[in-house]
Amino acid sequence: MIIYLHGFDSNSPGNHEKVLQLQFIDPDVRLISYSTRHPKHDMQHLLKEVDKMLQLNVDERPLICGVGLGGYWAERIGFLCDIRQVIFNPNLFPYENMEGKIDRPEEYADIATKCVTNFREKNRDRCLVILSRNDEALNSQRTSEELHHYYEIVWDEEQSHKFKNISPHLQRIKAFKTLG
């Protein structure tokens, strides 16, 4: 089972395309939708939905995957639910760059202070990070500097922020998923 979390643009047709591409790895791909505008509510909702899916799951090696803001959530929810994560161009600093787009961007900073201390150290090697060199929305170099101590970083030379085509990375994602 692969759980997919969309980014800020929840209505993007690219979400459906990514789900179809992920089905080459595992036919059981589930998209969880969330508001993107209310961080504390989103966190509760995502934890509840992922937990529900894991309770009914028969896959011994589930994976959670997210793009942009969905990558922010996939890393945290995956850690809290003890499943591996794959994140594409994660938005690690939504409290800095989401002002005017969501109701309370400061809630992201608050969530960070309430998260498990040093969670990335405890999550070491359980997350695969795929970054675009052509990310027009986020500073991928800053993201790499923040995460490379803990996770493998894969650079993509073609894609933009929304990462429309993930197919060149499917084999690596499949191998990462099988590590469980």
Swiss-Prot record:
It comes from Escherichia coli O9:H4 (strain HS). This is UPF0227 protein YcfP. Disulfide bonds: none annotated. HAMAP family: UPF0227 (MF_01047). Pfam families: UPF0227 (PF05728). Belongs to the UPF0227 family. InterPro entries: AB_hydrolase_fold, UPF0227, UPF0227/Esterase_YqiA. The gene is ycfP.
